[in-house]
């Protein structure tokens, strides 16, 4: 049985999807982009600012589901420019400090709202 996870501490869905779904002890998030949940506005700073906001949104969503960064088993990071890989890693490492999750990082041509990155995760409760 699946449970829909939703929180105002992460951006509302901008399409027909859930912020996250829990099935048993597993949590599957949708991609989080750097939208400031309180205002609905985009974080328009550099890649580091956008990464902080997007990953912060992801962690807020996981917390709502009874999870945390420590319980993430896999992330996928979509970035518009692979030249930003090192900067994203620098921010990513502030959220995932030990026993980092498995991760894929994919360069894409375009992302929703023309942001620089999007991050999704699979975690346990």
Predicted features by range, described:
Residues 2-125:
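Short, polar/acidic, helix-capping and beta-turn segments at strand->helix junctions
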């Amino acid at each position: 049985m699946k449970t829909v996870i939703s929180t105002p501490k992460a951006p509302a869905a901008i399409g027909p999807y859930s912020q996250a779904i829990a099935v048993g002890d597993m949590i599957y998030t949708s991609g989080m982009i750097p939208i400031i949940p309180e205002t609905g506005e985009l974080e328009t700073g550099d890649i580091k600012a956008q990464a902080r906001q997007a990953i912060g949104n992801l962690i807020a969503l996981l917390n709502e589901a009874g999870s945390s960064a420590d319980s993430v088993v896999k992330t996928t990071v979509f970035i518009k420019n692979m030249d930003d890989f090192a900067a994203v890693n620098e921010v990513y490492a502030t959220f995932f400090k030990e026993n980092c999750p498995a991760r894929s990082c994919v360069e894409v041509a375009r992302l929703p709202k023309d942001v620089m990155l999007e991050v999704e995760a699979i975690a346990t409760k």
